[in-house]
Amino acid sequence: MPPSHSVAQIRDAERQTLATGRRLMPLAGAAAARHVAARIRPGAVVLALAGPGNNGGDALEAATGLRAMGHDVRVLLPSGAQGLPADAARAYAGWQAAGGETWSTLEPGFVPGLVIDGLFGIGLNRPLGADWQALVDTVNAWNVPVLALDVPSGIDADSGEALGRPIQARWTLSFIGRARGLERPGPGRDACGISEVDTLGVIMTPAN
């Protein structure tokens, strides 16, 4: 298994790569889209959960890629697009330009065939708020396959501890490197399902 890394190490590698002018979010989104396309049953609707940070941008890029492949995709953007970071805002603009459908709340009775969890990733360091927890609980109650991006939402990426009741993923696709919280025995490893890594071509130094 590839080595795991702290959030600080992953962030540092990301910053160094972005400083060269290389854009990573489109690469992450394309990798997630390929992952879903290889596993989704024909005709199933994909719901991409896009949170307020760059994890949400990865989900938006994945949604745009899947739509371009001909899949039926919806985006749930509970916190709106106004406060998105620059790269995530660019991903949202691409989703809009592609004609994608964006919801702020779930449609009554809607149940997707597969969920992309791009709510928080490695950025979560405090317990899920009540509204976010309610959304996670709804997703878990659907009992449909979930692909988590980087880390299942509701997990502390460094410690692997639960920050509420986390998303229960079937797969977790980590970008750049696997967070330590997915390797250690505990809620993080239990919630992540099958853990895979796409380095996006970023070189990580081995963790100590």
Swiss-Prot record:
InterPro entries attached to this UniProt entry: YjeF_N_dom, YjeF_N_dom_sf
Q: What is its EC number?
A: 5.1.99.6
Keywords for this entry? Isomerase, Metal-binding, NAD, NADP, Nucleotide-binding, Potassium
The cofactors required by this protein are: K(+)
Judged by the first EC level, this protein's enzyme class is isomerase
**Reaction equation(s) it catalyzes:** (6R)-NADHX = (6S)-NADHX; (6R)-NADPHX = (6S)-NADPHX
YjeF N-terminal domain boundaries: 10-208
List GO molecular-function terms, semicolon-separated: metal ion binding; NAD(P)HX epimerase activity; nucleotide binding
Q: What is this protein called?
A: NAD(P)H-hydrate epimerase
- Could you tell me which species this protein originates from? Achromobacter xylosoxidans (strain A8)
Gene responsible for this protein? nnrE
